[in-house]
UniProtKB/Swiss-Prot annotation:
SUPFAM superfamilies: YgfY-like
Purpose of the protein: An FAD assembly protein, which accelerates covalent attachment of the cofactor into other proteins. Plays an essential role in the assembly of succinate dehydrogenase (SDH, respiratory complex II), an enzyme complex that is a component of both the tricarboxylic acid cycle and the electron transport chain, and which couples the oxidation of succinate to fumarate with the reduction of ubiquinone (coenzyme Q) to ubiquinol. Required for flavinylation (covalent attachment of FAD) of the flavoprotein subunit SdhA of SDH and other flavinylated proteins as well.
Taxonomic source organism: Vibrio vulnificus (strain CMCP6)
Entry's family note: Belongs to the SdhE FAD assembly factor family.
One GO CC annotation: cytoplasm
Annotated GO biological process: succinate metabolic process
Keyword ATP-binding: no
Keywords: Chaperone, Cytoplasm
Nucleotide-binding listed as a keyword: no
PANTHER family in the cross-refs: FAD ASSEMBLY FACTOR SDHE (PTHR39585:SF1)
UniProt protein name: FAD assembly factor SdhE
Lineage, uppermost ranks: Bacteria, Pseudomonadati, Pseudomonadota, Gammaproteobacteria, Vibrionales
Length: 86
């Protein structure tokens, strides 16, 4: 769905202003993005447009996005990172 150039832009957008987000978002992109459905990929790209404080709150489980696509994607990101810890 995305061209190589578009994926490079998405990869760049995964670089956040907070190290705490970098260590969860970038590995998810690198290891899971290609396996996502087209809709999930769009949700992921849309999620990257959110502000870091909001994304951090959602990833830490202190809140939940009202956008169902974003909430679902955060769940996938968190689950992916938890699977690496176990």
């Amino acid at each position: 769905m995305y061209t190589t150039e578009e994926k490079a832009r998405i990869r760049w957008a995964c670089r956040r202003g907070m190290l705490e987000l970098d260590v969860v978002v970038m590995p998810f992109f690198e290891e899971c993005f290609e396996k996502l459905s087209e809709q999930e990929q769009r949700d992921f790209v849309s999620l990257l447009e959110c502000d870091d404080p909001d994304l951090f709150t959602w990833v830490m489980g202190h809140g939940r996005s009202e956008n169902l696509g974003h909430a679902s994607m955060v769940d996938k990101i968190v689950a992916h990172n938890l699977s690496k810890v176990r």
